[in-house]
Each structure stands twice: as structure tokens, then as C-alpha cells.
């Protein structure tokens, strides 16, 4: 087994979890692949309010963000959906990615279609591995 490679992968995942935590504390912004839609500002403002203990103000920003989203329909593994959102209300309709040592937000509204393999390892239930580009 190639434990050196596994150690590198887990090291990157742990570093990105620290980056993610800093983003939720409003200490660091997540990265974006494309310019984010305007409603992302309200999600980020909600994180900042939560970090300051201002839960009601955070809810106002989060609600404003959700109301501003116009289209989030698409396909995942061949099935269609009209709306998709993370179960973590802090990120809502954003896919969290860890790639190349970066913590990235990719709004579902910027994705047309997704495919994801079934989990093969226990860690796949925590961190979903990407498919190769030829499988997209």
C-alpha cells in the first residue's frame, strides 16, 4: 500500500477542514471557481453574523440569499431536481469542494449536471471523491 500518498491526501483534507472552519468563523473567504452570484454575499454575511453571535441577523441574510436564487434545477446521477441544497444551512445551495489545498464554494446554480460514484471507502462518506473529467 502507498501510505505516503494516503498521508498526503489526508493531510490536505485536514488542512482544508481548518480552512473551512476559518471560513465559517468569517476569518477567511472560501475560494470560487467562477465569479459568485450576488446572493453569495448574503450567505457570507450570515456566516459573519453567526461568528459574532448575531443569530437573528444571520437568519435575515440567509433568508435574503435563498429568496434571491432564481434557478437551481439540474440532474444528479441521471435524476432531475428542481431545487438542491446542502443539509448544512450555513452553505445552503452551495457545493463545498476541496481541491489542490483550497476550500471552494461552487453554487449549485453554476452546475448543470453532476455524477458521483458510490462510496468505496469509509472516508467517502465524509469526503466525496471526484470523478475523472471523462466521467463528467
Protein language model regions, located:
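Alpha-helical protein-protein interaction scaffolds
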Residues: 1-52, 57
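Long, positively charged binding patches that form subdomain-scale interaction surfaces
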Residues: 50, 55-136
Amino acid at each position: 500500500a502507498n501510505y505516503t500518498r494516503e498521508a498526503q491526501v489526508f493531510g490536505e483534507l485536514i488542512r482544508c477542514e481548518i480552512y473551512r472552519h476559518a471560513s465559517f468563523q468569517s476569518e477567511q473567504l472560501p475560494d470560487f471557481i467562477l465569479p459568485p452570484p450576488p446572493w453569495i454575499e448574503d450567505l457570507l454575511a450570515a456566516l459573519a453574523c453567526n461568528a459574532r453571535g448575531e443569530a437573528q441577523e444571520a437568519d435575515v441574510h440567509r433568508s435574503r440569499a435563498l429568496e434571491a436564487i432564481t434557478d437551481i434545477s439540474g440532474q444528479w446521477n441521471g435524476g432531475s431536481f428542481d431545487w438542491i441544497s446542502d443539509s448544512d444551512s450555513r452553505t445552503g445551495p452551495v457545493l463545498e469542494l476541496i481541491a489542490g489545498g483550497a476550500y471552494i464554494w461552487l453554487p449549485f446554480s453554476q452546475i448543470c449536471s453532476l455524477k458521483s460514484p458510490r462510496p468505496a471507502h469509509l472516508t467517502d462518506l465524509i469526503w466525496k471523491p471526484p470523478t475523472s473529467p471523462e466521467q463528467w
